[in-house]
């Protein structure tokens, strides 16, 4: 009898961190998480033999970096806030990595896909609170990029038969 592994609940993992942040810090925290996700996409790409998949994963990493840059660009003190976030949460880099480390690559992708949907939802909530129309539009584009990454992972998993 095989048992399905329990996948980490990213909402439970990261909500307490967001709860400790001001709204401006929340954007920067998400930017940090997007950059960390980009690192994972690049690492996964290194392990892929299919050139098209490798290209797609590197494109996903680029989207994550773009989202982070947009989030950082929406406020004047991004660098200061990033230092604050890293000081408050020095374990941030390992928190997610440790949560997915025992999982297979496909399970990691499933968790990441769920995380992408959560990131998109958070970006849409930031957009709803944004008073600047240009900033709101940028955040909605970023939400679509997170959804695009979730879709990529879902398609790869479907192709592999590992939904």
Report each predicted region and the residues it spans:
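Non-heme di-metal
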Residues: 2-163
């Amino acid at each position: 009898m095989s048992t399905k592994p329990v996948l980490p609940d990213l909402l439970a993992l990261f909500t307490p961190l967001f709860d400790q942040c001001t709204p401006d810090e929340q954007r920067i925290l998400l930017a940090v998480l997007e950059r960390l996700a980009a690192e994972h996409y690049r690492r996964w790409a290194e392990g892929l033999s299919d050139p098209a998949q490798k290209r797609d994963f590197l494109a996903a990493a680029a989207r994550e970096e773009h989202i982070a840059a947009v989030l950082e660009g929406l406020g004047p003190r991004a660098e200061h806030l990033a230092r604050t976030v890293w000081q408050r949460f020095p374990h941030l880099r390992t928190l997610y990595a440790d949560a997915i480390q025992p999982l297979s690559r496909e399970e990691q992708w499933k968790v990441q896909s769920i995380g992408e949907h959560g990131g998109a939802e958070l970006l849409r909530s930031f957009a709803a609170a944004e008073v600047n129309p240009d900033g709101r539009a940028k955040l909605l584009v970023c939400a679509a990029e997170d959804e695009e990454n979730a879709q990529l992972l879902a398609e790869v998993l479907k192709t592999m038969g590992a939904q």
